[in-house]
């Protein structure tokens, strides 16, 4: 890859509808990329480069990926984007159901194994499940047994979220490997949101210099082949606000979803030190 073409990047080409804060973060990303290539001889010798954009929902990954791709292409570096939305094994609705089932199964089983389950507990749990509040810590003060349910359920979620059980890392790594090896035509999975929407679409990698993997888990230990990991910082509150705006999920502001977001945020924070570029919020 001719890294010297990075000097031809023209930030004035950024579209007017890109928010000011996003423009600031994009400028930092470009500056850091130039510095990395200047200092890192190994990167200079790579024929093809993979950039991983990680961060929570609402951290700006999509805008960053699209803007970087636009600027790099205009500078003469052909860039393509691969989204991680198509990496999970299950369709979005089914994956949400799987997460909830693992939480509730583990929580209830813990109560049984600790001899805390009885008719009164069953009735309370069923009501909280119906109300979708069975991940709320507010109930623990008057129901000390409930902490066993929450602890076991949360542990089950921590083991599932971002794991090879939930995400098809093998598929992701195969695509990254194909790009690095110079494969010209690659079939990319399009998961869609419903069971009957799954398909594969042929992508042209023939002249691409850079692949941007835009995905929450692009900095995961299970992902192999990323040359430049970039971490976009965000908070749980920003992620929740983004989901509320999208309005794609049910029970968006429920205690269960807040638990999921908290776990994902902790995972991201634990991985961010591996990122070569970390970009904060302004």
Which ranges hold each PLM region?
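Walker A (P-loop) phosphate-binding loop of P-loop NTPases
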Residues: 58
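ATP-dependent NMP and nucleoside kinases share a basic, alpha-helical "lid"
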Residues: 141-148, 197-246
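Conserved lysine of the Walker
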Residues: 61
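Charged, amphipathic alpha-helical linker segments immediately N-terminal to NTP-binding catalytic cores
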Residues: 1-31
